Amino acid sequence: LRMSRGLGDVYKRQGRIKGLSFRSMNFIKITEQPSIHEDLEQKSVRELLEGINEEDRKVASAVHACIPQIEKLVNEIVERMHQGGRIFYLGAGTSGRLGVLDASEIPPTFGMPDTCVIGIIAGGEQALKRPVENAEDDSQKGWMELQDHHITNKDILIGIAASGTTPYVIGALQKAREHGILTASISSNPGSPLSSVADIPIEMIVGPEFITGSSRMKSGTGQKMILNMISTTVMIKLGRVKGNRMVNMQLSNRKLIDRGVQMLIDELHINKAEAKQLLQEQGSVKKALDAYKTNNCITKNN
């Protein structure tokens, strides 16, 4: 493992020693604690499903406890994006995939350029489909990849790691802070090294997983919920939603075109033919609404 001197100091403060293990009384990896569900292979399908669901019901409460920190982060993001800043999600494994997923949904849902919210995963695109060996253990690679995107202090970096100990993520956040970039983290262990290098740490404590150590489960579910909350709230505050409708969505298939037509019918109280024509002329629901209200009329075919 390549490790900067500063990153090594972080690990020392947190009790990190040889072999990347922790022996500090101040840091307990809840994500590695034994499951309360035992002898899983002896349970029926129904018992397994109910057990998983029982654990999943704990996630929403854990996320709710994080709302004050999420609110702080969203306010900072909105301010920076108004000034041309971008959101960067950075993670490895499931955490990285969830960041890439959330970023990929922003253009079609809210009509924003794909450069506004960027997801980066350790190991690159191939890691979206299969594990890339040792990718998360390189503490310098994350920052190098952020530099490829010309990250600046206008941007926001959100590091995602259930354990809070992923070198790829910690190293990137530490370097970002050194360059005056706002950093946030999402983890499932309190007092982790990742939290210590984040300006806004979000610690979502979901407890031990149904299968011991399988953080793709509750931790992954909670990460997805928090990412949904962040990106959705930011886009609403940036004016990308009207009422409760996705008026800036990309009209990329028949379903979305039909949805756009119905939005215009509901909002403007016009008939389906008029709505279709208006949408075709303007190219988006938002532009159609603005054009109609500006002109207070619609061009009709004779």
Please give the residue ranges for each predicted region.
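Short, amphipathic alpha-helical interaction segments embedded in low-complexity terminal/linker regions
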Residues: 234-302
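Short, basic, glycine/proline-bearing loop/turn elements
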Residues: 55-65, 131, 156-159
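Single conserved hydrophobic/aromatic residue that forms the stacking wall/gate
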Residues: 1-14
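A short, well-structured juxtamembrane/interface segment
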Residues: 65-80
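Cofactor-/ligand-binding subdomain signature composed of acidic, glycine-rich
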Residues: 24-62
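Residues at the C-terminal ends
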Residues: 82-83, 178
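Glycine-rich phosphate-binding loops that contact phosphosugars or nucleotide phosphates
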Residues: 88, 92-225, 234-238
